[in-house]
UniProtKB/Swiss-Prot annotation:
Protein name: DNA mismatch repair protein MutL
The organism of origin for this protein: Escherichia coli O81 (strain ED1a)
Family designation: Belongs to the DNA mismatch repair MutL/HexB family.
Entry-linked HAMAP family: DNA_mis_repair
Entry-linked CDD domains: HATPase_MutL-MLH-PMS-like, MutL_Trans_MutL
Gene3D superfamilies cross-referenced by the UniProt entry: 3.30.230.10, Histidine kinase-like ATPase, C-terminal domain, MutL, C-terminal domain, dimerisation subdomain, MutL, C-terminal domain, regulatory subdomain
Gene: mutL
Segments of skewed composition (Low complexity): 373-387
Length: 615
């Protein structure tokens, strides 16, 4: 048989073999998409265990009409755009293959509307080539995905589905994990037209324990020891059950989350088990709900088809950090249990649980940024320090550049024709649209360039600052806001709150969305250039800057932010320099025409050449 390119539907079905294991896999992927879209309410309707119908409706930001067809295409995503993004993933989804895979093994319909659109649009793919049809529809702001007749065209996969009850138990377990992670999101789950679970969004404080008790049971809550542990860039929060009172039923509660992503990680389980081993029997398992936050550059989530596992770059450090955090709490445990809220919470209708069928709970999801007031506040170990930005974090595994990069380095920077700043201004001449060819990196942060036989030296941090300012400055439309997976809640003074309210419209144009109450402000979304910054440091500094201003111009605020952003590169590579210059040439063509002295300096080789000739 000759080598040939597979049809799109067959290729998607092969990918679905890894992504879509059962109905619960579909629910997980779609709910994570809703969370990435900034949804605060998600309604999930299931029929016949998910084999007949899976419907996910959210109130997120929605999808534009022009992007609906792309949403159903393979490897199309809004989560990442470059290799650096892949090596510092902060969203739940990033591969852009879930919807394409699901639509290839079911009858999938996607209906969505953004706040800017007057009407909603519906898209579905059909046929051998998976052609996407888009038509008008009625729908509020947000997105609804309907998955009908899962595995209808793959009878072998459908044959391996378990009973309706078992498949729904798997779905129930997935929703349980997500509800534990996102206390700020309301999640409703129904099966065959009946409401089964209602997890209401709860504010900060004691009500988190109410939701914890509703999901994990009062027995776990009564034995739960709160953890709040921090060292450098690592933070551990959550609860671990007192091992002296752990029962087989409690031992099934094992949820861990890494940067908001539910995980099953042997390293984390081993660290917790080791900390509890003196008090656990040989056949006992610890019970815990833990949230680990780590520099995204120091963890690789792209190592498992279903994103169930991660790899830590400094696994021993992470292991010892978790071990010390859990051990410290166990050594300081008190006899009084966690405070229970006296207000009764309406109990959702229960269904018979089958946690064994759903697998042992090694998964977990992220808590909101504001930490629960812990029962124990262990003092940081000697030499520890408050969380700091990650200026020296190197993206990824420091991978060796392959042949593709060697070819890239030999290629001049892209010669794109930028739009003139003003309509009446003539287009730039072709030979002035590029800074030139990158020859090498000098002193880790300068690029040596060659153009038309002339040599110049360019400051990469200054170029990066100009690029960030261009990305942040709003044009005809506001800068796109990226919802934060974990909203940032900060305490502010009356003066700072007043300044924020005056600057709210300007900040909205920059893609910064927030809500304020009496004494706090909650940052809900930021523009893309800020996603990889340490917002716990940057946002308070921005608020302090705004409090000193009387006029709030988006351009001035964008300039201040650009000057205060931490560089993503401690040491520049040639590939990074080439990418940066291509972006600067595209977004800042005026810099190519008249570069400022702090950005580009000519290097005069004539004295050196003359000296060589005189010898």
């Amino acid at each position: 048989m000759p080598i040939q390119v597979l049809p799109p539907q067959l290729a998607n079905q092969i990918a679905a073999g890894e992504v879509v294991e059962r109905p619960a896999s579909v629910v997980k992927e779609l709910v994570e998409n809703s969370l990435d879209a900034g949804a605060t309410r998600i309604d999930i309707d299931i029929e016949r265990g998910g084999a007949k119908l899976i419907r996910i409706r959210d109130n997120g930001c929605g999808i534009k009409k022009d992007e609906l067809a792309l949403a159903l295409a393979r490897h199309a995503t809004s989560k990442i755009a470059s290799l650096d993004d892949l090596e510092a993933i902060i969203s739940l989804g990033f591969r852009g293959e879930a919807l394409a895979s699901i639509s290839s093994v079911s009858r999938l319909t996607l209906t969505s509307r953004t706040a800017e659109q007057q009407e909603a649009w519906q898209a579905y793919a059909e046929g051998r080539d998976m052609d996407v049809t888009v038509k008008p529809a009625a729908h509020p702001v947000g997105t609804t995905l309907e998955v009908l007749d899962l595995f209808y065209n793959t009878p072998a996969r459908r044959k391996f589905l378990r009973t309706e009850k078992t498949e729904f138990n798997h779905i129930d377990e997935i929703i349980r994990r997500i509800a534990l992670a996102r206390f700020d999101v309301t999640i409703n789950l129904s099966h065959n037209g009946k409401i089964v679970r209602q997890y209401r969004a709860v504010p900060e404080g004691g009500q988190k324990e109410r939701r914890l008790g509703a999901i994990c049971g009062t027995a776990f809550l009564e034995q739960a020891l709160a953890i709040e542990w921090q060292h450098g860039d690592l933070t551990l929060r959550g609860w671990v059950a007192d091992p002296n009172h752990t029962t087989p039923a409690l031992a099934e509660i094992q949820y861990c989350y890494v940067n908001g992503r539910m995980m099953r990680d042997r390293l984390i389980n081993h660290a917790i088990r080791q900390a509890c081993e003196d008090k656990l029997g040989a056949d006992q398992q610890p019970a815990f709900v833990l949230y680990l936050e780590i520099d995204p550059h120091q963890v690789d989530v792209n190592v498992h088809p279903a994103k169930h596992e991660v790899r830590f770059h400094q696994s021993r450090l992470v292991h010892d950090f978790i071990y010390q955090g859990v051990l410290s709490v166990l050594q300081q445990q008190l006899e009084t249990p966690l405070p229970l809220d006296d207000e009764p919470q309406p109990a959702p209708r229960a269904i018979p649980e089958n946690r064994v069928a759903a697998g042992r709970n090694h998964f977990a999801e992220p808590a909101v940024r504001e930490p629960v007031a812990p029962r124990y506040s262990p003092a940081p170990a000697s030499g520890s320090r408050p969380a700091a930005p990650w200026p020296n974090a190197q993206p990824g595994y420091q991978k060796q550049q392959g042949e593709v990069y060697r070819q890239l380095l030999q290629t001049p920077a892209p010669m794109q024709k930028p739009k003139a700043p003003e309509p009446q201004e003539p287009a730039l001449a072709a030979n002035s649209q590029s800074f030139g060819r990158v020859l090498t990196i000098v002193h880790s942060d300068c690029a040596l360039l060659e153009r038309d036989g002339n040599i110049s030296l360019l400051s990469l941090p200054v170029a990066e600052r100009w690029l960030r300012q261009a990305q942040l400055t709003p044009g005809e439309v506001p800068v796109c806001a990226q919802p934060l997976l974990i909203p940032l809640r900060l305490k502010v003074s009356g003066e700072e709150k007043s300044a924020l309210e005056k600057a709210q419209s300007a900040l909205a144009e920059l893609g910064i969305d927030f809500q304020s109450d009496a004494q706090h402000v909650t940052i809900r979304a930021v523009p893309l250039p800020l996603r990889q910054q340490n917002l716990q440091i940057l946002i308070p500094e921005l608020i302090g800057y705004l409090a000193k201003q009387s006029v709030f111009e988006p351009g001035n605020i964008a300039q201040w932010i650009a000057r205060n952003l931490m560089s993503e590169h401690a040491q520049w590579s040639m590939a990074q320099a080439i990418t940066l210059l291509a972006d600067v040439e595209r977004l800042c063509p005026q810099l190519v025409k008249t570069p400022p002295g702090g950005l580009l300096q000519s290097v005069d080789l004539h004295p050196a050449i003359k000296a060589l000739k005189d010898e």
